[in-house]
Regions:
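Structured beta->alpha junctions
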Residues: 15, 40, 71-73
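A short gly/proline-enriched turn/hairpin at secondary-structure junctions
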Residues: 29, 35-46, 57-61
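Short beta-edge strand/loop motif at the mouth of beta-sheet-based domains
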Residues: 43-53, 74
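Short, aromatic-enriched amphipathic alpha-helices that serve as compact interaction elements
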Residues: 3-21, 29
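A beta-strand edge to alpha-helix "cap/lid" segment located at domain peripheries
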Residues: 1-6, 22-25, 56-151
Length: 151
C-alpha cells in the first residue's frame, strides 16, 4: 500500500516545474485567484497574470536558479517545504539603497514555503527567505548597516 499523500506528487511536480523554469506549468498548478507572497521582499502577486510577472523577474535575475527540497511536510490541504536555492545573479540587485553587480559566482540561500491548497491546486504561496544569508551570499558585507538604514 502506498502511504504517500496525494499532495506529495503535486508538490514534486511543482518543484520540477520551478527547476525547469516552466512558467506555464507552474501557473497551471495555481488557482486563478492564487496569491504569491514573498514576505522577505514584501512583493505580492494576486492572480495568474501577476504571478507570471513575478516568475519572469525571478528567472531573469537568476537564469540558473534551482531549488532543492530539504524537508517537506504535508497535511490535508497544506504543504510546508524547507529548501535551499542556488543560482547566479545575472542583473544588478539593490537592497537598502546599495547595489551589488553580478559576479558570475553561484550563491545559495535557504527558505521556507507555506502552501495552502484548494483541492489539488495551489491557493497561495507564502515564501520566507533567510534574508541575511541571501544578502551575505550576494556580497553585502555590511548587512547590519543596510537593515539599520531601513528603519
Amino acid at each position: 500500500m502506498n502511504s504517500e499523500h496525494p499532495l506529495e506528487q503535486v508538490i514534486a511536480a511543482y518543484g520540477e516545474a520551478w527547476n525547469g523554469h516552466d512558467i506555464e506549468a507552474i501557473l497551471a498548478m495555481h488557482t486563478e485567484d492564487s496569491v504569491f507572497q514573498n514576505h522577505t521582499s514584501g512583493g505580492q502577486a494576486i492572480g495568474k497574470a501577476a504571478i507570471r510577472e513575478i516568475l519572469k523577474g525571478v528567472f531573469a535575475a537568476f537564469p540558473d536558479i534551482r531549488f532543492d527540497a530539504r524537508r517537506t511536510y504535508v497535511r490535508d490541504g497544506l504543504v510546508t517545504q524547507e529548501w535551499t536555492a542556488s543560482a547566479t545573479l545575472a542583473v544588478p540587485y539593490t537592497s537598502g539603497g546599495v547595489t551589488v553587480q553580478p559576479t558570475g559566482k553561484k550563491i545559495s540561500w535557504n527558505g521556507v514555503d507555506v502552501i495552502p491548497f484548494a483541492g489539488n491546486l495551489i491557493a497561495r504561496k507564502d515564501v520566507y527567505v533567510d534574508s541575511m544569508g541571501f544578502l551575505r551570499a550576494l556580497g553585502f558585507t555590511q548587512v547590519g548597516l543596510i537593515v539599520a538604514s531601513n528603519r
